[in-house]
Amino acid sequence: MMLRARALTAVSAVAALSACSQQGELVIDQGVGIASVLTLCPAVGIPDYTGDVTTFGPGADRSVGSLDVSAAMTDLRATCNDTADKVYSEASFTVNARRTDTRGARTVTLPYFVTVLRGGSAVISKRVGQVTLTFADGQDRATGTGKVGSFINRADAALPEDIREKITKRRRAGDTEAALDPLADPEVKAAIARSRFEMLVGFQLTEDQLAYNVTR
């Protein structure tokens, strides 16, 4: 399973940031062309190739003619509470599915995962859940919903005080440091990376299902 996404989808950075309280944010705007927002809340998204799942009928045929059920994860929405010692992030999503054989009512259960990454690669936690979809007789479409949540230690998501001071230090026009972006400082960049978390949601795919998504 590829957990690290090349790009996060479904939830924009603006939405992720606006979900957090103002007390948990570090707003940087010193009037020298530097403006940024650092938040205790994790970024939320769907890793590449894990937002869709396709199942096929018996046998090794993977052509369109043998397709059984296809489903897509969409409408991912996140909220975050960063006022306690444990930062709690919650996300809800919708799964839209379609089947090829519409004869009879049918219930399909699809597994999904939620994982928390720190610094872009370290897996802090992972859990697997299920979403159930019910197709009515004669219908080719069904919809299901899911909800996930994760806790993050507030202390781990907060920047050390010395790093905050480096970032928020007031820079006056004409100062040598005025033209320098504090976020480009290697020490600052490393500290920010350690404090950045992601909560990623996607279908729990088999190796064959993942390979199909990558190559189609």
Model-identified regions with their sequence ranges:
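Bacterial N-terminal signal peptides that target proteins for export
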Residues: M1-A10
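C-terminal motif of bacterial Sec signal peptides marking the signal peptidase cleavage site
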Residues: A16-A19
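Bacterial signal peptide processing site
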Residues: S21-G24
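Short, solvent-exposed beta-strand/turn "edge" segments of beta-rich domains on protein surfaces
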Residues: D61-V69, R77-S89, R99-R106, G120-I124, ...
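Beta-strand elements of well-folded, non-transmembrane domains
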Residues: D75-D82, A91-D101, Y112-G120, F135-D137, ...
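Post-signal peptide N-terminal segment of mature Sec-exported envelope proteins
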Residues: D29-F56
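Intrinsically disordered, low-complexity, charge-dense segments enriched in Lys/Arg
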Residues: T143-D208
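An exposed acidic His-Trp-rich patch
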Residues: T109-L159
